[in-house]
Amino acid sequence: METIAKHRYARTSAQKARLVADLIRGKKVAAALEILTYTNKKAAALVKKVLESAIANAEHNDGADIDDLKVAKIFVDEGPSMKRVMPRAKGRADRILKRTSHITVVVSDR
C-alpha cells in the first residue's frame, strides 16, 4: 500500500532539496530517518518532517507496519518564486527570487 505526504511551498529551492532527497530514495524508513537526522542541511529537516508525516499517514490510515515501510518515491518540484527587490548603487535595483518547492514523499510496504 502506497501512502503519500506533501509539503507544498517549502521555503527552499528545489535544487537544494533534491540533494537531500537523493540520499534517501529507495531506503527503509528507519535508515532514511537516521540519514536525515545527521545531514547538516536545512532541506534535511524539511524532508524529515514530510517523511515522518508519510509514516504516520501509513500507520494511521492504512494500518501499515512501520518496520516494513520503505521510501518508494521522493521527488521535489519547483513552487512559485516570491519576487523581491534589492536596492543597488546609483538608484538601481536588482530582483531577488525567493524560491519555493513542493516536496512529495511516497512510502510503501512492498
Curated annotation (Swiss-Prot):
Signal peptide boundaries: none
Keyword terms of this UniProt record: Ribonucleoprotein, Ribosomal protein, RNA-binding, rRNA-binding
GO cellular component: cytosolic large ribosomal subunit
One Pfam assignment: Ribosomal_L22
GO biological process terms on file: translation
GO MF entries: rRNA binding; structural constituent of ribosome
Claim: Membrane is one of the keywords in the record: no
Positions of transmembrane segments: none
Keyword Ribonucleoprotein: yes
HAMAP family found in the cross-reference section: Ribosomal_uL22_B
Family: Belongs to the universal ribosomal protein uL22 family.
Protein function: This protein binds specifically to 23S rRNA; its binding is stimulated by other ribosomal proteins, e.g. L4, L17, and L20. It is important during the early stages of 50S assembly. It makes multiple contacts with different domains of the 23S rRNA in the assembled 50S subunit and ribosome.
Subunit structure: Part of the 50S ribosomal subunit.
Name of the protein described by the UniProt record: Large ribosomal subunit protein uL22
Gene that encodes it: rplV
